[in-house]
Amino acid sequence: QISASVKSDGGIRFIGRAGVGVDNIDIGEATNKGITVCNTPGASTRSVVELTIGHLIASTRHIATADRTLRNGEWAKKQLRGSEIGGKRLGLIGFGRIARGVAAIASSFGMEVHAFDPFVDEAPEGVQLHDDVDEIFRYCTHISVHCNLNEQTRNLVNFERISLMPGIGLDGIECGNHIVS
């Protein structure tokens, strides 16, 4: 949090964003005040890819819940039976650097990988591109969202789309504003 006095005294010359999204920065106001704004695309790609795969495995295997119940003295083995991700269908919304990394690892686990990105014409072998984002929700058991937040992607994930899914599994949400709660 930057205080109002710091903003108004002209001391800020540069705002650096560790990551891609700059939707939380008023670029117009920064430009008017002569403040340079930059982001760091690619700097944390591998970390986000690994975290996304970690969330995918943790959610399908109920790792966090199992940890909590075990710490509370319960052994809930039967209630927390997870499933393997191999053979499941992963839908990637957005197919840039992060999603491509997720696709490569998910494929190595035996997942069937599908992607939607209106700006991508070709996908690597083993990834099926779709022209309609609703197809991803209809067909895939797990969804991972990896696109910049803008007016076209705000509230992209909503009740209607989630209700299309054969099973529920949302992962890799880079920004919660993609989801309508």
Predicted regions and their residues:
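Phosphate-binding beta-alpha-beta segment of Rossmann-like dinucleotide-binding domains, i.e.
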Residues: 33, 41-89, 101-105
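Hydrophobic residues in well-ordered beta-strands that form the structural core
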Residues: 24, 37-39, 115, 131, ...
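Short, acidic/turn-prone active-site loops that include or flank metal/cofactor-
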Residues: 18-22, 42-45, 119, 136
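ADP-ribose/adenylate-binding Rossmann-like module
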Residues: 11-26, 163-181
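An N-terminal-biased, well-structured beta-alpha scaffold segment characteristic
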Residues: 1-38, 138, 158
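Rossmann-like dinucleotide/phosphate-binding beta-alpha-beta segment
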Residues: 78-166
